[in-house]
């Protein structure tokens, strides 16, 4: 198991798609026609602070001003980690700290892409919102966008956006569960083996460790038998009461698969 590698060709294609999606969204926003936008709200401040604590252990920092962060800060972070051993891990945790994007009929901007206008236009063969947008564009280009047609789209698009967002979340969850199942099957053959990983999350009940092969598992607090550990919420770490031993975000540890 290894992280997916985005090569130069992939990045070029992604850039073309982003530009096309942004251009179409901006054009139809200013035409003031009914439309389906792809929006992404600002991240939760607490999650961003947690991300900042995590990356500090790798020597990186992000500037958080007045309880909010500018998307350029995260873009700079991703540029700094490009090609480094910790790129995949920090990239995934950065993504987890974001809110989930959704489909809406009002353009409120896209935080992750740092743009005011965005939509999904480039893949009508596999995403319904893209197909809906192509129908709107077709009506508009052929001169059929009269008042009756506008009222039609005004009546159906809110439900289209809501349903598409719900179905996307279901599909994402199914994909995550499938990935988890395959990772469990893979690690089942490696029970008893020792791996080195990085602490990717800390909670009252223990901490999570992510291995270089992207598999993540829980080290429950009851398995830490050398001391009684308590959770320090302010610094996201487990601290031993007698030994003062620390387990914190970003720390490298060795684990036994059980």
What are these language model-derived features?
Residues 202, 255-257:
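A generic structural signal for residues embedded in beta-strands
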